[in-house]
Amino acid sequence: MVRGPAGAWAVLGPLLWGCGLALLQGGMLYPQESRSRERKELNGLWSFRADFSDNRRQGFEQQWYRKPLRESGPTLDMPVPSSFNDISQDGRLRSFIGWVWYEREAILPQRWTQDLGTRVVLRISSAHYYAIVWVNGVHVTEHEGGHLPFEADISKLVQTGPLSSCRITIAINNTLSPHTLPPGTILYKTDTSKYPKGYFVQNTNFDFFNYAGLHRPVLLYTTPTAYIDDITVTTDVDQDTGLVNYQIFVQGSDHFQLEVHLLDEEGRVVAKGTGGQGQLQVPSAHLWWPYLMHERPAYLYSLEVKLTAQTSAGPLSDFYTLPVGIRTVAVTERQFLINGKPFYFHGVNKHEDADIRGKGFDWSLLVKDFNLLRWLGANAFRTSHYPYAEEVMQLCDRYGIVVIDESPGVGIVLAQSFSNASLQHHLEVMEEMVRRDKNHPAVVMWSVANEPSSFLEQAAYYFKMLIGHTKALDPSRPVTFVTSSSYEKDLGVPYVDVICVNSYYSWYHDYGHMEVIQLQLATQFERWHEAYQKPIIQSEYGAETIIGFHEDPPLMFSEEYQKGLLQQYHVILDQKRKEYVVGELIWNFADFMTDQSPQRAIGNRKGIFTRQRQPKSAAFLLRERYWKLANETRYLQSAVMSQCVGNSPFTV
């Protein structure tokens, strides 16, 4: 832990790190309504208060969770989901580090509070970074990590007494330490001639703003007390027969029956089974294909599971439906294969980032982004640099957008961040991530980290253990991390299945000299492949551009420079994709916010779209390229032409 001048950890810490996380058990199925399940979203306005006290502990010392938050002092209306940073006009809140408090009163349906055969669950989809939760003043759960969901069974708290409401209080701390994901450090400024006593700043080693708050939906949902806890599905193909292997876990009863039906998109039952595990065979199966690779992409079956259980209160039934895409993924020395066919990633890196809402989930923004992805002809993106919202993954399944699913392992550059404590937490994060996203056909590869100091001696053991653990959790998908180290010094790449390389030739060095890009990029690819004989993805490349800046001949930050740099990369990518390069992902889809610095003009401007999703010149260049690539690499001839005539906009 980072320690202050008195030898104790930064005053933000004592309540933050009081307990370690045990290895995860149980499922994390997405809450859905069914014949046996209900859900109540708690999105909207919450009461909010930041703890501006010197030690950031006033809320705990005064036990703000024991009574309505408004009684503790002034509160703000805070929208959920949203980051809190850009909502208010108080500049202190934008860069606030420490504990903030959220509260919401929820009115519950009478059946939820009186039917003892009903289980009531509170689910928080994302709270950045560390969260403690109380219901009616009673502690119910804690969670470390800002990008994955967590839950608490609150049935006993809401099913006692005449109350038909519950008061939910959530305290969130956004402090990052060398052992968090992502990591960071607290730096105390001790020169009292320049800084007030106790002044500190949060330092990070990643290039995006450390937005915080309740970023994704908060909701209540119900199940019977005997319920379907988890479902795991893997798929395979035997000639034209699709194979769906399933495993179902039940909680709340040892005496139960399970019925499983697989339905096609027309609602017809194509296979059925019984029991907690088995294999369904689907003759003449429709496979799940990526967008633009097939005339019928993203085909989804529905796996309907019915549980009938005997309990002390009598028989109970539970129903859950899981979308299933039948597809295979494989990697050779030179190819990435989906359903046995070579797949070429032509896509983007993204961020969950937008004006005002920060990293807050927004359906309007999400649908707009997917419309832009399809307009662009992109077939893939990486969830740089953390797991995205579950709803994002669901749309990827529906639209056929392939996903490299990345953990929050960004900024792992200090030796302390390779410690056993860091590794243990990273292993747990991968468990949470795989548990949540394992059933999404769009997810074709796990990425455990981005640009770590993989040249450090500790990195070899760290990535051997981390990648091995991820493969043990999910043997069906390849695993990678994204490197910016040199091929001869990287100690983690020997353990990956696909080499993902970030490089910024003629941007972060050789400024303005685009004439060296082709030589340097070709050399990069040749040395990596000669050393490891693995397929390679150019996982990041790009240039910063401020829309409306024009210079000819091209100068840095102009739209012409961004276009010219991309064109130089594309020359070599076109050569090497015929050999062993299997993808290219531009950095970035859209401009995004960063910490303030002389190097950043209100954020990172490497997007091909502005933060408001307006296209720069490079967007049209990339669109022309991606549609050309789609036509060259499609599996069936009618795949692209049926949706894009003359490379014109289309409606799906």
UniProtKB/Swiss-Prot annotation:
Catalytic residues of the enzyme: 451
Keyword presence, Glycoprotein: yes
Species assigned in the record: Sus scrofa (Pig)
Pfam families for this protein: Glyco_hydro_2, Glyco_hydro_2_C, Glyco_hydro_2_N
Its job: Plays an important role in the degradation of dermatan and keratan sulfates.
Sites where a glycan is attached: 173, 420, 631
Chain's gene name: GUSB
Descriptive protein name: Beta-glucuronidase
N-terminal signal peptide: 1-22
EC annotation from Swiss-Prot or TrEMBL: 3.2.1.31
Assembly and oligomerization: Homotetramer.
